[in-house]
């Protein structure tokens, strides 16, 4: 019998926890240990692959080898681990409980956790780690679909990134497309304040501009890299390699660590003749293949497209050919980030002698970033201004526009509506569509093209025209790179689930045995195949994280789907909304039912020529009448809302959002008393007089204490009261007339009576809408106590109103003298702000720092609010930027030297 002590290489219990926070010990052995020397252990261990993704370890009993045999080879070192699962020993057919390696320092050394980009196009964001040390590769956005109304951007789960910020040691960006950098303004605040961000020089220019737009200044954390030059990021030594794409400075990443090598291709294609001369680096891939690639992750976007992509040089020739053939004005549209395509358009303009005009903010954004980085094919200052278009003949112009995807505010889309301020489309125009329709945008792009065709310009587009080439590799290129790299394991990324599955099959066809497909939030463990005692097939599922998508519907609104009420927006857009306002009037002396002025407003609803609206008004009045006299306003709102919702559901099958707002009018006069009073009936005079006393009682006392200039004559008071009574009577009379009109004008269907029409809405007013017994009891208690306290309340109200009027008379507005900043105070603010600069680099919590500056000023006898200090600093920065360009201002402005000492030393200032 085997002693328990000899099994100490395995854990005696299984663990189902995921993502351990334990750091890997520095002395962790690199190989799994055997239970004891082979010459002493009577057991032989075999490793069998489970039907699941996880691997299992099985053992069988055999005779111990002779001591003199070659079994005295190297003894494997012990490696402990937490395992779970069930395995079976095939030798003795005994089913045993086996254990599988799991997370933590004892699990697979290489770990992959996609936060976005798998099973979708866009929002690329992936965690790659060595044990519990991770780097974040890319942080992009995804554009919304039609079932997300009002949303502009979709981002990865920043809450999860914030929870894991102690594990994320660096951010590495592959290139500058929005689906790879667009979420950085939201991701960076979620990370540790010292986490560095690595990117190529052109990509970094785009990142700086994006962060500046959101008020984020982290200059000290932004690091640039160059291809084939290694740098350290977290647990990995990273070597960027050159790949060709539809944007400059696109890089693949080769990650090295002691436990294996990982190749992340980024977005790529193989262009044999790129316009910038930077060809796809096959030599680097061949060298890395010889070194050994444990895991390869590759772009899957165009795996369903057979063959190979065409070169950007072919597109450039096609553009020149079409521009030369055009006799009128030429208008092109393409992706603004494709700097190489803009260079081809510039070449076509130069050959044909046309002037170049850029219409669209994003075009200038990418061009200026490329100009600062030295990669721009066009000098931005050489472009014709948009307002000068009319000064040139159409045959002398080449207009470059945004809007290839029919974005709502893009230049070409606005021109298709005829609402562009830059230019108007004409029948003589030639439009070159040098782009691809992104999946999901087909409908709106086709509508834009239909509007353009209706105006009359000639549209040139399509594959046969060679006006566009994809920036993502086709199937032939994907297969070639798989054969060059020859990875041990392959994980398709960047694409819909269908694309990932097809790319996995392509990997298997090239001879890669270990492939898999995972989804966002699924953590995958990978081990080098030489470490077979850890994982027999190299892959292990380490659990799943429930990620939440984050949404932005503007510059400030940001949150989850529930926080931005996306489902509610969709429901309102589909089923409509009803807004019900009720002005409640409690009954007078001669009445015992509630009355109210009801107004119903609907949006996005079919009203059946007013029939449904009539039914809603009738039901609302009936539901309100069914409520007790002492019914709370909240119960009225709930009762009427429920009735209206049921009516619409039965009438049209929709479930609209119903918003009911009930307000009480304590000064309203009952219609019968007003009518009797105006007709001169003395029997109801006491009721109106009592009401008049209640209404005017407080005003008389307050007016007695007002200044003589504010007093009103008795005639004016009587005239005002009479006008109010007449208005109230008119209001109630109109309401009764309207109610009767609804009853009389409802079109009754043939073969049905008015009673049947009334039964439609009466059936919805059921006992369920009445108050509960506890509510009724509370109402009765309130009703019993109100008469007793009426006299006290009236007298108390009179006193309070009189006191309030007295205080208003005594208080008069005073002129507030502006407290200007003194020069010595400004110097102190500059000094204190400079001392706290490093803390101001943290995006959140800046107001607390301004409060600290304000308190420090208060300690020195200077009373300034945090907002005043912040406004002063913003003004100083603006003045400093203006003074830098003016030599006279440098000497005349007394604070220039102090500001220059701080800002020139610290870099970009944070406000």
Swiss-Prot record:
Subcellular location: Plastid, Chloroplast
Main location: plastid
Gene Ontology molecular functions: 5'-3' exonuclease activity; endonuclease activity; metal ion binding; mRNA binding
Residues where substrate binds: 336-338, 468-472
InterPro entries assigned to the protein according to its UniProt record, in alphabetical order: Metallo-B-lactamas, Myb_DNA-bind_4, RibonucZ/Hydroxyglut_hydro, RMMBL, RNase_J_2, RNase_J_b_CASP, SANT/Myb
Complex formation: Homodimer. May be a subunit of the RNA degradosome.
Official protein name in the record: Ribonuclease J
Source organism: Arabidopsis thaliana (Mouse-ear cress)
Lineage: Eukaryota, Viridiplantae, Streptophyta, Embryophyta, Tracheophyta
């Amino acid at each position: 019998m085997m002693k328990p002590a000899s099994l100490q290489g395995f854990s005696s219990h299984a663990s189902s926890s995921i993502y351990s926070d334990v750091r890997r010990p520095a002395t962790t052995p690199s190989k799994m240990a055997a239970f004891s020397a082979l010459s002493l252990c009577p057991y032989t261990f075999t490793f069998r692959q489970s039907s699941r993704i996880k691997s299992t370890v099985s053992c069988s009993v055999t005779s111990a080898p002779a001591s003199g045999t070659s079994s005295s080879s190297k003894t494997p070192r012990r490696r402990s681990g937490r395992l779970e699962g069930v395995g079976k020993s095939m030798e003795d057919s005994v089913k045993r409980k086996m254990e599988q390696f799991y997370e933590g320092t004892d699990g697979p050394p290489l770990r992959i956790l996609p936060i976005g980009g798998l099973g979708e196009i866009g929002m690329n964001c992936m965690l790659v780690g060595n044990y519990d040390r991770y780097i974040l590769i890319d942080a992009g956005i995804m554009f919304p679909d039609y079932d997300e109304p009002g949303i502009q951007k979709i981002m990865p789960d920043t809450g999860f990134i914030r929870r894991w910020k102690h594990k994320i040691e660096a951010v590495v960006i592959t290139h500058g497309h929005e689906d790879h950098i667009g979420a950085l303004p939201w991701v960076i605040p979620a990370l540790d304040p010292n986490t560095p961000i690595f990117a190529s020089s052109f990509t970094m220019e785009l990142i700086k501009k994006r962060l500046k737009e959101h008020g984020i200044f982290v200059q000290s954390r932004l690091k640039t890299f160059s291809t084939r030059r290694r740098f350290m990021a977290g647990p990995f030594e990273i070597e960027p390699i050159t790949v060709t794409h539809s944007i400059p400075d696109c890089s693949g990443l080769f990650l090295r660590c002691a436990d294996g090598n990982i190749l992340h291709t980024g977005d790529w294609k193989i262009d044999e003749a790129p316009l910038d001369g930077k060809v796809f680096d096959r030599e680097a891939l061949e060298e890395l293949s010889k070194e050994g690639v444990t895991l390869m992750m590759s772009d899957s976007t165009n795996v369903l497209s057979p063959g190979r992509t065409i070169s950007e040089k072919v597109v450039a020739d096609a553009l020149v050919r079409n521009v030369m053939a055009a006799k009128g004005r030429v208008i092109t549209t393409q992706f603004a980030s494709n700097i190489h395509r803009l260079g081809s358009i510039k070449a076509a303009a130069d050959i044909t002698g046309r002037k170049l005009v850029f219409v669209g903010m994003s075009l200038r954004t990418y061009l200026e970033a490329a100009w600062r980085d030295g990669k721009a094919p066009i000098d931005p200052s050489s472009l014709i201004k948009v307002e000068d278009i009319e000064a040139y003949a159409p045959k002398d112009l080449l207009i470059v526009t945004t809007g290839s995807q029919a974005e709502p505010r893009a230049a070409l889309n606005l021109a298709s509506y005829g609402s562009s301020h830059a230019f108007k489309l004409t029948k003589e125009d030639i439009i070159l569509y040098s782009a691809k329709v992104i999946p999901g945008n087909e409908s709106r792009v086709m509508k834009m093209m239909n509007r353009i065709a209706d105006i009359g310009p000639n549209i040139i587009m399509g594959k046969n025209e060679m006006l566009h080439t994809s920036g993502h590799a086709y199937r032939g290129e994907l297969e070639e790179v798989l054969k060059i790299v020859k990875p041990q394991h392959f994980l398709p990324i960047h694409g819909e689930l269908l694309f990932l599955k097809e790319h996995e099959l392509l990997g298997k066809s090239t001879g890669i045995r270990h492939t898999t497909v995972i989804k966002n939030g699924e953590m995958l463990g990978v081990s080098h195949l030489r470490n077979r005692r850890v994982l027999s097939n190299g892959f292990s599922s380490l659990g799943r994280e429930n990620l939440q998508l984050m949404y932005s519907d503007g510059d400030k609104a940001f949150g989850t789907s529930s926080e931005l009420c996306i489902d509610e927006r969709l429901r309102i857009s589909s089923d409509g909304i009803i807004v019900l306002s009720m002005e409640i009037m409690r009954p007078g002396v001669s009445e015992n039912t509630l009355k109210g002025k009801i107004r119903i407003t609907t949006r996005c609803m079919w009203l059946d020529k007013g029939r449904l609206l009539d039914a809603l008004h009738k039901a609302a009045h009936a539901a309100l009448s069914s409520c007790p006299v002492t019914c709370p306003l909240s119960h009225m709102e709930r009762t009427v809302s429920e009735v209206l919702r049921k009516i619409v559901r039965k009438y049209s099958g929709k479930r609209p959002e119903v918003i009911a707002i009930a307000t009480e009018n304590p000064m309203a006069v009952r219609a019968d008393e007003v009518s009797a009073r105006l007709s001169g009936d003395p029997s109801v005079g006491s009721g109106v007089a009592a009401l008049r006393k209640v209404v005017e009682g407080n005003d008389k006392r307050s007016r007695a204490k007002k200044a003589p200039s504010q007093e009103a004559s008795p005639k004016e008071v009587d005239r005002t009261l009479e006008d109010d009574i007449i208005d109230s009577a008119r209001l109630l009379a109109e309401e009764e007339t309207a109610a009767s009109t609804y009853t009389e004008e409802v079109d009754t269907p043939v073969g049905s009576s008015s009673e049947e029409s009334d039964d439609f809405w009466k059936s919805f007013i059921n006992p369920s809408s009445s108050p509960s017994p506890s509510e009724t009891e509370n109402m009765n208690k309130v009703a019993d106590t109100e008469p007793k306290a009426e006299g006290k309340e009236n007298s108390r109200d009179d006193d309070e109103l009189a006191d309030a009027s007295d205080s208003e008379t005594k208080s008069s507005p005073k002129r507030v003298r502006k407290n200007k900043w003194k020069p010595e105070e400004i110097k102190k603010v500059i000094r204190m702000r400079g001392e706290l600069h490093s803390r101001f680099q943290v995006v959140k919590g800046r107001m607390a720092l301004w409060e600290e500056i304000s308190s420090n000023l208060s300690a020195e006898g200077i009373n300034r609010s945090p907002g005043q200090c912040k406004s002063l600093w913003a003004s100083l920065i603006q003045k400093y930027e203006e003074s830098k360009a003016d030599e006279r201002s440098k000497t005349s402005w007394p604070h220039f030297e102090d500001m220059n000492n701080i800002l020139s030393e610290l870099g970009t200032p944070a406000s």
